[in-house]
């Protein structure tokens, strides 16, 4: 699979086969992540793999949103009016816990920070944050080339505090998201994407 095929194949799914991802495959995916550009050339990234169900149960402080009315109220509160966008959230919210607990591989990526992430002194202060997301995108594309799909989820503040205790990571490292990767279930739902043309997004010389 070439890079363009992997880009087309990469999709977000939240329903997985009951099948673990082999460590050799995980290492290849992380190695692809480590090939991403990095702001300081040091690639100060670390990865915690959590594949045991008991360990995941102890780690995760996430709940599925099972109430459709609650979900609709949340979307209204966000001011979402696009139906494709709303459908994405309707798909996601009831699976917030299950997509992480039942995945074939749960990866917790970490990156080293120089100053508090939510109190940057300048745009350049976010270079570390930008670099780890380049790494994560490489990993998602590598996973797609392996026949794996998945989802990322950004933790809430209370989740991050619990993860710090559960995993024991250093104070100067931050987890930007959970990465759940696995083999798609046969009935895995794949929400429709908005069709967007590159030509409509390109501006020559001026906006």
Label for each model-derived stretch:
Residues 31-35, 90-95, 163-166, 188:
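Glycine-rich, charged/polar anion/phosphate-binding loops
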Residues 44-45, 103-106, 175-176:
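Short, surface-exposed beta-edge/turn micro-motifs
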Residues 161-175:
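Short, electropositive alpha-helical surface patch
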Residues 6-12, 174-207:
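C-terminal helix-cap and adjacent tail motif
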Residues 49-131:
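Glycine/small-residue-rich phosphate/adenosyl-binding loop
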């Amino acid at each position: 699979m070439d890079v363009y095929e992997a880009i087309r194949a990469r999709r977000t799914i939240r329903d997985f086969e009951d099948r673990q991802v082999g460590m050799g495959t995980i290492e290849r995916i992380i190695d692809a992540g480590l090939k991403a550009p990095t702001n300081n050339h040091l690639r100060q990234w670390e990865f915690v793999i959590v594949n045991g169900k008991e360990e995941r149960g102890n780690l995760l402080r996430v709940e599925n949103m099972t109430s459709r009315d609650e979900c609709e109220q949340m979307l209204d509160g966000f001011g979402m009016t696009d139906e494709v966008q709303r459908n994405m959230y309707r798909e996601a919210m009831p699976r917030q816990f299950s997509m992480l607990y039942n995945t074939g591989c749960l990866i917790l990526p970490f990156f080293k920070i120089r100053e508090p992430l939510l109190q940057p002194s300048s745009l350049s202060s976010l270079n570390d944050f930008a670099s780890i997301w380049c790494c994560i995108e490489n990993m998602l594309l590598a996973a797609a080339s392996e026949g794996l799909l998945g989802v990322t989820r950004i933790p809430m503040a209370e989740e991050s505090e619990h993860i710090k205790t559960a995993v024991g990571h250093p104070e100067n490292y931050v987890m930007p998201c959970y990465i759940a990767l696995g083999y798609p279930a046969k009935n895995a739902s794949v929400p429709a994407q908005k069709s967007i043309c590159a030509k409509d997004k390109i501006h020559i010389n001026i906006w």
